[in-house]
Amino acid sequence: MSNSNIHPTAVIAEGANLGKNVKIGPYCIIGAEVVLNDNVELKSHVVIEGITEIGENTIIYPFASIGQPPQILKYANERSSTIIGSNNTIREYVTVQAGSQGGGMITRIGNNNLFMVGVHVGHDCKIGNNVVFANYVSLAGHIEVGDYVIISGLSAVHQYARIGKYSMIGGLSPVGSDVIPFGLVSSKRAVLEGLNLIGMNRKGFDKAESLSALKAIKEIFSSEGNFAERIKQVAEKYKNNSIVMQIIDFLNQDSSRAFCHFEK
């Protein structure tokens, strides 16, 4: 391949196997047993070590780390590997760690996947094709993920779990069990618990007015009947309370999302 595709600050160990039209950006580090197939692009500051193969047309963004040893105490420098397929997009700060003796010695990722910022793929995971992992998804070791799975941001999956094909995991979800194919799972969403009275007091809001506003939001969100009508009634009842009126103004604005309510 042409040296013009390799930045002069990149460190490529002797023995690394680079395919056609591979592009390696500034300050990347490539180990001696790494295979980069045709048209792989490393943006900058990417570290790929161990026995690792990256499939063609895969793009890896800055500060990703691929092929490092598994994070397990019993790892004994066994020659495990990391195999990543073709047409993957691996964004900033993604970590993919090599397999271990207890898991078949291979961490394997398929084709056409998107790994957003900060995703962690633990040792011995087996990931299919066309999956999307949103920001900071974390997979422990030995996890199997089927094709076309979507895992939303900041979700974590327990070791040895199986995530069936075409399933979706909602954001901020701790997944400790298998997810059936086509399943939709999510953790409990945030609920309204009141007003930030301590913070309001620190910012100089009148205490009596704040407590009155707390009563007002309970009337809005906890009472029976039509929600829009309750907003109108509270707006009239508390029209001299500036805190309530700011809340009413917020409630009357157009939004693509629902409001957090008190837990029922």
Curated annotation (Swiss-Prot):
Q: The organism's lineage?
A: Bacteria, Pseudomonadati, Pseudomonadota, Alphaproteobacteria, Rickettsiales
Keyword field: Acyltransferase, Cytoplasm, Lipid A biosynthesis, Lipid biosynthesis, Lipid metabolism, Repeat, Transferase
Q: Which InterPro entries match?
A: Acetyltransf_C, Acetyltransf_C_sf, Hexapep, Lipid_A_LpxA, Trimer_LpxA-like_sf
Q: Which reaction does it catalyse?
A: a (3R)-hydroxyacyl-[ACP] + UDP-N-acetyl-alpha-D-glucosamine = a UDP-3-O-[(3R)-3-hydroxyacyl]-N-acetyl-alpha-D-glucosamine + holo-[ACP]
Q: What does the record give as its pathway?
A: Glycolipid biosynthesis; lipid IV(A) biosynthesis; lipid IV(A) from (3R)-3-hydroxytetradecanoyl-[acyl-carrier-protein] and UDP-N-acetyl-alpha-D-glucosamine: step 1/6
Q: Name one GO molecular function term.
A: acyl-[acyl-carrier-protein]-UDP-N-acetylglucosamine O-acyltransferase activity
- What do we know about how this protein assembles, alone or with others? Homotrimer.
Compartments in which it is found: Cytoplasm
Per its UniProt record, what NCBIfam families does this chain match?
Answer: lipid_A_lpxA, PRK05289.1
Supply the enzyme class, top level. transferase
Example of a GO biological process term: lipid A biosynthetic process
GO cellular component terms? cytoplasm; membrane
The catalytic activity of this protein is classed by the Enzyme Commission as: 2.3.1.129
Question: What family is this protein classified in?
Answer: Belongs to the transferase hexapeptide repeat family. LpxA subfamily.
* Known function: Involved in the biosynthesis of lipid A, a phosphorylated glycolipid that anchors the lipopolysaccharide to the outer membrane of the cell.
Can you say what this protein is called? Answer: Acyl-[acyl-carrier-protein]--UDP-N-acetylglucosamine O-acyltransferase
Instruction: Name the Pfam families for this protein.
Output: Acetyltransf_11, Hexapep
Q: Which organism is it from?
A: Rickettsia canadensis (strain McKiel)
Location, primary (coarse class)? cytoplasm
